[in-house]
A protein has these predicted regions:
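Transmembrane-helix signature of 12-pass secondary carriers
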Residues: 1-172
């Protein structure tokens, strides 16, 4: 009976860790996918100024800085789960907002909102994973978060490749 209970507990820990590590996946994905979207949002918003284009790309990182700065306070005040849920809501709002933005300022605003969510998750995901993991397996579980960041980067590069190929083909 005890062996079955341990197996169920480890399955639960794995599930928690994989869900929490989605913060890393989103961080890696969002960090890179904007590069592939660059020609599309530049054309859509009529961007010709390199500074404006750079702001569109880096604005999420400004939000990340803010999210990371407040993450410790949020974790101490509200625990780990609620701020992680809020980070997922912020990222979802960012995805929706950037998709429907009709003005460049709104596009940047929603990129910053998503950045705050990613900044929260990038600090809180490994913290939460470490807290729910058994001490003897903590390193393995926390490393999953870093792995998901790299998987997010890879996924974004693959998406960018799929987007860029048709654009390059139609340009010739």
């Amino acid at each position: 009976m005890k062996n079955t209970q341990n197996h169920l507990n480890m399955s639960y820990v794995w599930m928690i860790c994989l869900v929490a590590a989605c913060g890393g996946l989103l961080f890696g994905y969002d960090w890179v996918v904007i590069g592939g979207a660059k020609p599309f949002y530049e054309a859509y918003f009529g961007i010709t100024d390199p500074a404006q284009s750079g702001w569109a790309m880096s604005s999420a990182l400004a939000g990340c800085v803010f999210g990371a700065l407040i993450s410790g306070w949020c974790a101490d005040r509200f625990g780990r789960k609620l701020p992680l849920i809020i980070s997922a809501i912020l990222f979802s709002a960012s995805a929706w907002g950037t998709a429907v933005a009709t003005h460049f300022d709104w596009f940047v605003f929603y990129r910053i909102v998503g950045g705050v969510g990613i900044g929260l998750a990038s600090a809180l995901s490994p913290m939460y994973i470490a807290e729910v993991s058994p001490a003897e397996k903590r390193g393995k579980f926390v490393a999953i978060n870093q792995l998901t960041i790299v998987i997010g980067v890879l996924a974004a590069q693959l998406v960018n490749l799929m987007i860029a190929d048709p654009v390059a083909s139609s340009a010739t």
